[in-house]
Amino acid sequence: MKKMTVWALAVLMAVPVMADTTSENVSEKKENTQDNSEFMSDERTEEGFITSYLNSAIASGMQQADQQAEKEYGRKVTSYVSAPKFGGYFIGKYAATNQDGKHSGDGFTQRLVRLYVDGTILDDFAYRIQVQTNNASFHMKDFFVEWKKYPEFKVKIGQYKRAFGLENPMNPWDVGVGDYSQLTKKLTGHSDFIGAENTSNGGRDQGIQIQGDLFPAEDGHRFVHYQLMVSNGQGINTADANSQKDITGTIQIQPIKGLFVGAYGWTGNFTATNGVTVNRNRYLLFAKYDANDWSFRTEFAHSTGHKVSDYKVDEYTGEASWTGTGRADGWYATVGIPCTPWLKTWLKYDAYRDNGQWGSNKSIYSVCPVINLHKNLMFQPQINYVHDRNSVSDPNYTEFWLETYVRF
């Protein structure tokens, strides 16, 4: 199945790439945006109430300077760059639970603070730099450049979201509920279920990717999207640990505007600091529909490949063996219901099986009214009912979250 997925993507890449020069209104160019595609492949960033003034001032100054610039190309050219778009936001969280033994975790936390800058060079190359801090942990999230001259064929290199998972590339503002699904966190590389020390990577890796949107319709939407990424497999801010590369990719169909269906594939491995290498062979199916501010999204993913902790060496014989099932899967369904111009309520069912069997299932039922009083100000009160078969003492409990989002 892995070979069929890779070959299907390879065949699609071989289709001659041509820009649609007869319908500029179909693929309208949007300056200073990383991805103006309807198919989401990376987080969509926006300026906030402070950075909007900064960006406007920079853009105004650059326009005056560019009026005197000669239009030519070369290593000494310094014009033909867009005004960089700065942005940032923070998410604060209060959490409480009635789960036995977990009350000490109740309280306020800093979920994250992010700063980013986007822009273009020569109009054909887009770049992004994004950094994040979680309490005392400061690290680089994204750094990449993408040649994007044609919507049918783009080339990206750097550190960015893996080509695996529909929810994975979403900005936290756009997920709906107050956290990513268990599927996304465990099976797309956010805090991967293999359990090694360097697998909390926010679904990102370092590598090179080609992607594009094919076959424009009369109403402007594109029927087909593809991505194919070759990456280290070790995650962010670290060098490769073995000679093999991970391959991730997707084929997505948009038969009518707003309806998306498709599949992702991932084959590769991860080498931990103790020298143990585990395989990651995964597939994912999804559907998504957005219309009139109503939203629906569902995903199913399956993984084969052991955890690092499954590797055992007998202390007497020295023989190595693997424990566990070497499988995991998860699925979720969520719907967003528009209520008022400032209120949209999200419902979500989220399930994950850590060893691919029902005895390891953890189900979360969530209700989350999202309160948008301003484009740059959002509140998320959320109630979760959790049924966790992995917990013997208290498998059923309730959680309450309150998250505050501010884009500055």
Regions found by a protein language model. Give the residues of each.
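C-terminal closing repeat unit and adjoining cap/tail of repeat-based domains
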Residues: S366-Q382
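Outer-membrane beta-barrel proteins
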Residues: T97-G101, M140, L166-P169, Y180, ...
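N-terminal periplasmic/intermembrane-space "pro-region" immediately following the signal or transit peptide
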Residues: T5-W7, V15-I91, F408
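Outer membrane beta-barrel
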Residues: R75-I236, A241-T248, Q252-V261, T334-C339, ...
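Extracytoplasmic loops and strand-loop junctions of Gram-negative outer membrane beta-barrel proteins
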Residues: N98-D100, G189-I194, G233-Q234, N269-A272, ...
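Detector for outer-membrane/organellar transmembrane beta-barrel domains
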Residues: V81, Q252-N355, S363
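Outer-membrane beta-barrel "beta-signal"
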Residues: I371, N376, N396-F408
